[in-house]
């Protein structure tokens, strides 16, 4: 399955969940596209709830179905911790996500483009693979020629706070994944247990 590249607000309205994290997509029209007036989603079956939760998580991080399911399988091979928690941590360790968490991009999609176009370095070496798994302590930065990109400047100006498991040096324009996140520090509106149930059904 290919990656969705259309308007994220449409997906947000369909899922009843803000992919941007701002809630703006749902503030004016809190119902699915094609519906008018009140939300007519109705009650979902157990499978429907599991599927919706899986789609919420997959679309939040911008992965294809294959990437998502492969990462889920990897999480299942980690011996310590819960499957769902480990899955969330692996999603957070993706390079495109860390770039987003550092504030170098306004959205994960924008962060993925920065990585794809060769603007990002890890420990001083250019890395253009969005799925690259970042280790705690690795230094994430912009290439020298990329530090004046307007989209980066705008993203940094819009930052109002960062998650506690990353650190960013505004002067050096570089940051690190300080440690692996705790589940409590990630989106509370995602129920990863339903995602585990979906794949284990």
Swiss-Prot record:
Q: Write out the entry's keywords from A to Z.
A: Ribonucleoprotein, Ribosomal protein, RNA-binding, rRNA-binding
List the InterPro entries hit by this protein, alphabetically.
Ribosomal_uS4, Ribosomal_uS4_bac-type, Ribosomal_uS4_CS, Ribosomal_uS4_N, S4_RNA-bd, S4_RNA-bd_sf
What CDD domains does its record include? S4
Task: Offer a single GO CC term for the protein.
Answer: small ribosomal subunit
UniProt region (Disordered), positions on chain: 20-46
Q: Name one GO biological process term.
A: translation
Against Pfam families, the record matches this protein to: Ribosomal_S4 (PF00163), S4 (PF01479)
Every copy of the S4 RNA-binding domain together lies at: 93-156
Task: Show the GO MF annotations.
Answer: rRNA binding; structural constituent of ribosome
* Family membership: Belongs to the universal ribosomal protein uS4 family.
Q: What role does this protein play?
A: One of the primary rRNA binding proteins, it binds directly to 16S rRNA where it nucleates assembly of the body of the 30S subunit. With S5 and S12 plays an important role in translational accuracy.
How does the annotation summarize its subunit structure?
Part of the 30S ribosomal subunit. Contacts protein S5. The interaction surface between S4 and S5 is involved in control of translational fidelity.
Name this protein carries in UniProt: Small ribosomal subunit protein uS4
- The protein's organism comes out as Ligilactobacillus salivarius (strain UCC118)
């Amino acid at each position: 399955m290919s990656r969705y590249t259309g308007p994220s607000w449409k997906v947000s309205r369909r899922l009843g969940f803000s992919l941007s994290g701002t809630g703006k997509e749902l503030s004016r029209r809190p119902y699915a596209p094609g519906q008018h007036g009140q939300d007519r989603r109705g009650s979902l079956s157990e499978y429907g709830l599991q599927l919706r939760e899986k789609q919420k998580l997959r679309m939040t991080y911008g992965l294809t179905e294959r990437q998502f399911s492969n990462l889920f399988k990897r999480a299942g091979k980690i011996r310590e911790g819960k499957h769902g928690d480990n899955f969330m941590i692996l999603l957070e360790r993706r390079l495109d996500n860390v770039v987003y968490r550092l504030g170098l991009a306004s959205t994960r999609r924008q962060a993925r483009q920065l990585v794809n176009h060769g603007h990002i370095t890890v420990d001083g070496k250019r890395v253009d693979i969005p799925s690259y798994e970042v280790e705690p302590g690795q230094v994430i930065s912009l290439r020298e020629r990329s530090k004046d990109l307007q989209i980066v400047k705008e993203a940094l100006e819009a930052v109002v706070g960062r998650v506690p498991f990353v650190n960013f040096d505004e002067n050096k324009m570089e940051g690190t994944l300080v440690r692996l996140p705790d589940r409590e520090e990630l989106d509370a509106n995602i129920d990863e247990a339903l995602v585990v149930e979906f794949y284990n059904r």
